[in-house]
UniProtKB/Swiss-Prot annotation:
This is Large-conductance mechanosensitive channel. The gene is mscL. PROSITE patterns: MSCL. Homopentamer. It is found in: Cell inner membrane. GO terms for biological process: monoatomic ion transport. It comes from Synechocystis sp. (strain ATCC 27184 / PCC 6803 / Kazusa). Keywords: Cell inner membrane, Cell membrane, Ion channel, Ion transport, Membrane, Transmembrane, Transmembrane helix, Transport.
Amino acid sequence: MVKSARQGAGGFWRDFKDFILRGNVVDLAVAVVIGGAFTSIVNAFVAWLMAVLLQPVLDQAGVSQLQDLPLGLGELVIAIINFLIIAFVIFLIIKAIEKMQRKKAVEEEIVAEAQPDPVLEAQTNLTDSINRLITTLENQQSSSQ
């Protein structure tokens, strides 16, 4: 009973290890870490953007900070700007990846076209061999007559 429980636990840990070592789980973990760091960068950029570009407008409107707008509109504006920046950067990254994938697909297609079809090549070799054999047999028959 104890031995089977150990085997079950070993199977569980082995399955867990296999799950963790899958490429997509590791990729997801890396993406989460990079996403967190990128969010910090975007937040700092938006804070700078607010200070440099929007603060003069807010001062003229009599608002000291964007967060002071009624009904939490300032935080909503900041969240929308953060979202738009992050969405734009992700869009650019996806476009770059798609471009690289298209380029790779074209290169693979060119390589595939350059390589002869092994089945067709084998059929050609067999046909040539059969034709040589027929010629040899015909020559032997004609020389024996």
